[in-house]
Amino acid sequence: MSFNKIILVGNLGRDPELRYTPQGDAVCSFSMATNERKKDKSGEFQDVTTWFKVTLWRRQAENASKYLSKGSPVYIEG
């Protein structure tokens, strides 16, 4: 068995979208960007942005929808 874990630190790219399943469970989706500074072949630093799609469920989904908005800093672990 293998186990993978990811930690993301970045900012929301758009406002969270809250919806509910037919069973009544809250689901919140948003995009977030992480930024990294890397040297290119010429030795100059370049900012590299990577985008992630994030989905939260139930109470976390409701809290994210209530307290986060585009540009909010976020820490995601999962």
Predicted regions located by residue number:
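Single-stranded nucleic acid-binding surfaces, predominantly the OB-fold ssDNA-binding core
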Residues: 1-78
